[in-house]
Amino acid sequence: MRKETPPPLVPPAAREWNLPPNAPACMERQLEAARYRSDGALLLGASSLSGRCWAGSLWLFKDPCAAPNEGFCSAGVQTEAGVADLTWVGERGILVASDSGAVELWELDENETLIVSKFCKYEHDDIVSTVSVLSSGTQAVSGSKDICIKVWDLAQQVVLSSYRAHAAQVTCVAASPHKDSVFLSCSEDNRILLWDTRCPKPASQIGCSAPGYLPTSLAWHPQQSEVFVFGDENGTVSLVDTKSTSCVLSSAVHSQCVTGLVFSPHSVPFLASLSEDCSLAVLDSSLSELFRSQAHRDFVRDATWSPLNHSLLTTVGWDHQVVHHVVPTEPLPAPGPASVTE
């Protein structure tokens, strides 16, 4: 296991404070979500979880190192309520799960200085906690504290299907990157469901969660179409094969609830695991720890791997920090005299 190595300090190009039109003057404190785009631009979702109004906002940074400084963003917009989750739809679309109960689709204009609302649909009756775009790119899935899961047609701006297969609030949905009709969901009813919308009975239960410990996070393996990972409220991360519906591996990674799991784009992918214990852990294919950071001072809420530098992992949290981690990609040296350095 290797501790965090600070990224090399490269003198940044001279930046000019230039708040774009319609961008809020101030970003909310709690950073909930982060996603890199394929060109390396960084999208942030922020929420204010104190006071009488739960506000939120979206921010695009062409220079991720400038985040979360509002004056150096490329585009920004105020949202009606807090941002619980977000994801890219193509290169310019932004799908948002809102604390208001809405699923929102925003779009960058051609100059990428404005974020414009395409639709805002109140189909859920409580906070929308999670969204995921199906691999086709034309449909999406949302999960809510109202117990419902909904499948959306993004172009038609309508709900195609609504499901109440869970018995408690939905904590995470994850679309398969391999099959455009398949996704996972987990809930506070202590169940993980595997969905295939082509089937008359689309949901089947994966019986792998530990009794008494609620699953909180899901992520599909990017290369193995039948394999996924999940994290639970106890801090454990487990690897599951859907063919056998059993846990292949399990590891106690954190001391508190797992808040997110994100695979890297490596040929043999790493897994970033985030937690309410304020730490980030990076795991290898056997769920052994390669790297750990405790740079955050509050819950770590999201992570995203840079598409341009596969060693760079960016995390955000409720402490308003955007932390860029350099993760070692080479095998660790074996212990012994040969590994001693001056």
Curated annotation (Swiss-Prot):
Highly expressed in heart, skeletal muscle, spleen, testis, uterus, prostate and thymus. In testis, expressed in germ cells and Leydig cells, but not in peritubular myocytes, nor in Sertoli cells. Expressed in prostate cancers, in seminomas and in Leydig cell tumors. The modification Phosphothreonine is found at residue 5. It is found in: Nucleus; Cytoplasm. It comes from Homo sapiens (Human). Non-catalytic component of the methylosome complex, composed of PRMT5, WDR77 and CLNS1A, which modifies specific arginines to dimethylarginines in several spliceosomal Sm proteins and histones. This modification targets Sm proteins to the survival of motor neurons (SMN) complex for assembly into small nuclear ribonucleoprotein core particles. Might play a role in transcription regulation. This is Methylosome protein WDR77. The gene is WDR77. GO terms for biological process: epithelial cell proliferation involved in prostate gland development; negative regulation of epithelial cell proliferation involved in prostate gland development; oocyte axis specification; positive regulation of cell population proliferation; positive regulation of mRNA splicing, via spliceosome; protein polyubiquitination; regulation of transcription by RNA polymerase II; secretory columnal luminar epithelial cell differentiation involved in prostate glandular acinus development. Its main location: nucleus. WD repeats lie at residues 22-75, 78-116, 123-162, 165-205, 209-250, 253-293, 295-330. It comes from the Eukaryota. PROSITE patterns: WD_REPEATS_1 (PS00678), WD_REPEATS_2 (PS50082), WD_REPEATS_REGION (PS50294). Component of the methylosome complex composed of PRMT5, WDR77 and CLNS1A. Found in a complex composed of PRMT5, WDR77 and RIOK1. RIOK1 and CLNS1A bound directly to PRMT5 at the same binding site, in a mutually exclusive manner, which allows the recruitment of distinct methylation substrates, such as nucleolin/NCL and Sm proteins, respectively. Found in a complex with the component of the methylosome, PRMT5, CLNS1A, WDR77, PRMT1 and ERH. Directly interacts with PRMT5, as well as with several Sm proteins, including SNRPB and SNRPD2 and, more weakly, SNRPD3 and SNRPE. GO terms for molecular function: methyl-CpG binding; transcription coactivator activity; ubiquitin-like ligase-substrate adaptor activity. One of its GO terms (cellular component) is Cul4B-RING E3 ubiquitin ligase complex. SUPFAM superfamilies: WD40 repeat-like. Keywords: Cytoplasm, Nucleus, Phosphoprotein, Repeat, WD repeat.
